[in-house]
Design a protein with these regions (language model features):
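Catalytic-core elements of nucleic-acid end-processing and repair enzymes
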Residues: 1-459
Length: 459
C-alpha cells in the first residue's frame, strides 16, 4: 500500500501522530507505549512503539478490539486524518472493512487545536450517541504509567514489560473497585448539568431571538457551513493558509510559554521568537487586507483578542476567518454557532444520562451473573459431579474458596446496587428489570444500539 505524501496538518496545526511512516530512532529500540482505554479509564490494550506515532499502531489496536468487542466509537486526537487512512486501506484489504462500522471521534480537548470546521464535524461533543465522553481518558493512563519512566529506562526489556504490566493491572483493579462510585457521581453531575444546559439554551435562544422551531435549522446551517470546503483563488488561498498556520502557531507557543520552560533565559529566547512570528502574522494580515474588499478584511483587534491566553471569552477559543464564512451568512454565522454549541451540549447531556443508566444496569447484571455461576459450580462440586482428581481435603478447600468468593461478590452486589439506587432515586426501580425500555423513560427519541456496545479510545 503506497503511503500518502504530506504532513498531518489540520487547520494550521501539525500533528506528529498523523503520518503513515516514520524513521526508527538511532539510539532507541522502543520509542514509547501506545494504549487503548475505555471511556471509564480502564486499560484494554497496549503495545510498544518502534517507529514513533504512526497510523499502523492504532489500526492494529482497533482491529484487535473490534474482534473482541462491539465498539461503537473509536477516539483519537487525529481522527480527521486517521479516518481517510482506514477508508483507503479498506478498499484493498477486505478484512479491515468491519472497522468502518465504528464511528470516528475527535477527543474534545484536542479538537480545540484543530480548525473550527474540523471541530464541528469530528469533535466528540457533536457526535450523536457519544454522550459527554471527553475522549481524553487515555491521558490519565499515560500520566500514571509515566511514573515508571524514571526506573524502567534502566531495566532490561523483560523487567520493563513486567513493571508496566504490574502497574497496568493495579490501575485497572482500582478503576474496577471504584466503578460504582464513578458512575453514581457521573450520573448526579450529568443530571444537574443537563437541566442547566437546557435552561442555558432557552435563555440564549430568547436573547438571540431564535424560536424553538428555528434552532434545528440553525444547527443544520452550521453543519452545512462546516462541510463546505470552498476557497478563493490560489494566491489568496496561500495567504489564508499562512495566516491560519501563523495564528495557531503563535497561540500555542504563547499558551505553552510557562508550561514547557523553567528558566527565564529560555523564556526570553522564546518571547523574542514569539514577537517575531507575531509581527510576521500581522504583516501577512495587512497584505491580505490590501487584496480583498472592505467587507472581507480581517479585523486585527479580533486576532489580538484570539491570541489572548488569559482571556476567558469563548469566542477567543476559535477564530472564524472571513474566508470561512459564506457571503450570505457573514453577519450571523457566529450567532448560529452559539446556538449550535448550546444545543449540542444539551443533547449530549441527555444522552449521557441514558448511557450511564445503561452502564449501571450492565454492572449489576454482570455481578448477578457472576454470583449465579459461582453457585452453579458449588452445587456441582457438592454433588460430586465436578470434583476432578482432588482428595477430600482439597475438595473442602476448593469449596471454602468458592464460598468466600461468592460472599465477596454478593457483598459487592449489595454495595453497588445501594449506590446506584441512591444516585438514581425514583428511576432506580428499573435497574435490574429484564427490558431496556424502562430505563429509557421519556427519552424514546434517542436510539441506541445493543447494550454490548462500548466506546474506547486509542492514542
Amino acid at each position: 500500500m503506497k503511503s500518502t505524501a504530506g504532513r498531518g496538518v489540520c487547520g494550521a496545526s501539525q500533528w506528529s501522530a498523523a503520518r503513515e511512516t516514520a524513521r526508527r530512532a538511532s539510539k532507541l529500540d522502543e520509542e514509547g507505549l501506545e494504549v487503548v482505554v475505555c471511556r471509564h479509564g480502564m486499560l484494554l490494550r497496549a503495545l510498544n512503539m518502534y517507529r514513533g506515532e504512526i497510523f499502523a499502531y492504532p489500526l492494529y489496536l482497533q482491529k484487535e478490539l473490534q474482534a473482541a468487542t462491539n465498539g461503537q466509537f473509536y477516539c483519537t486526537d487525529i481522527a480527521c486524518k486517521y479516518w481517510p487512512y482506514i477508508e483507503k486501506l479498506a478498499v484493498s484489504m477486505l478484512d479491515l472493512r468491519p472497522l468502518l462500522q465504528m464511528r470516528p471521534f475527535l477527543s474534545v480537548m484536542h479538537a480545540k487545536a484543530h480548525s473550527t470546521k474540523c471541530e464541528i464535524i469530528w469533535s466528540g461533543k457533536n457526535q450523536e450517541g457519544a454522550g459527554t465522553t471527553a475522549g481524553e481518558e487515555v491521558e490519565m493512563v499515560n500520566s500514571y504509567l509515566s511514573r515508571c519512566a524514571l526506573t524502567t529506562k534502566y531495566m532490561t526489556k523483560s523487567a520493563r514489560n513486567d513493571m508496566l504490566t504490574v502497574h497496568a493491572i493495579g490501575w485497572n483493579r482500582q478503576k474496577k473497585k471504584c466503578l460504582h462510585l464513578a458512575l453514581s457521581s457521573r450520573y448526579i453531575k450529568t443530571f444537574k448539568k443537563a437541566e442547566a444546559e437546557s435552561q442555558r439554551l432557552e435563555d440564549l435562544s430568547s436573547e438571540l431571538g431564535c424560536p424553538e422551531n428555528i434552532v434545528h435549522q440553525w444547527v443544520h446551517d452550521v453543519r452545512q457551513w462546516a462541510t463546505d470546503g470552498t476557497r478563493c483563488d490560489d494566491d489568496q488561498s496561500n495567504l489564508q493558509k499562512s495566516i491560519e498556520q501563523m495564528f495557531l502557531g503563535v497561540h500555542q507557543k504563547k499558551a505553552s510559554l510557562y508550561n514547557q520552560t523553567d528558566s527565564n533565559k529560555i523564556r526570553h529566547l522564546r518571547r523574542r521568537r514569539l514577537w517575531e512570528e507575531k509581527r510576521k502574522l500581522f504583516d501577512t494580515i495587512k497584505l491580505y487586507n490590501e487584496q480583498v474588499p472592505d467587507e472581507e478584511r480581517i479585523v486585527e483587534e479580533k486576532v489580538v483578542s484570539g491570541l489572548s491566553v488569559a482571556g476567558g471569552d469563548r469566542e477567543a477559543e476559535s477564530v472564524i476567518w472571513p474566508w470561512e464564512v459564506h457571503s450570505s451568512e457573514s453577519s450571523n454565522i457566529l450567532t448560529k454557532k452559539k446556538i449550535f454549541d448550546a444545543y449540542m451540549s444539551k443533547v449530549r447531556h441527555e444522552e449521557e444520562k441514558i448511557i450511564v443508566m445503561r452502564e449501571m444496569r450492565q454492572h449489576c447484571t454482570y455481578l448477578k451473573r457472576m454470583a449465579d455461576n459461582i453457585r452453579t459450580v458449588i452445587s456441582e462440586i457438592s454433588s460430586g459431579r465436578n470434583s476432578g482428581c482432588l482428595n477430600e481435603e482439597g475438595h473442602r478447600g476448593l469449596l471454602c474458596l468458592l464460598q468466600k468468593r461468592l460472599a465477596d461478590v454478593e457483598e459487592k452486589f449489595q454495595v453497588v446496587c445501594s449506590s446506584y439506587r441512591q444516585a438514581l432515586g425514583p428511576n432506580a426501580s428499573s435497574l435490574l428489570e429484564d427490558g431496556p425500555e424502562e430505563m429509557l423513560e421519556d427519552h424514546e427519541e434517542v436510539d441506541y444500539e445493543s447494550s454490548d456496545d462500548s466506546d474506547f479510545e486509542g492514542v
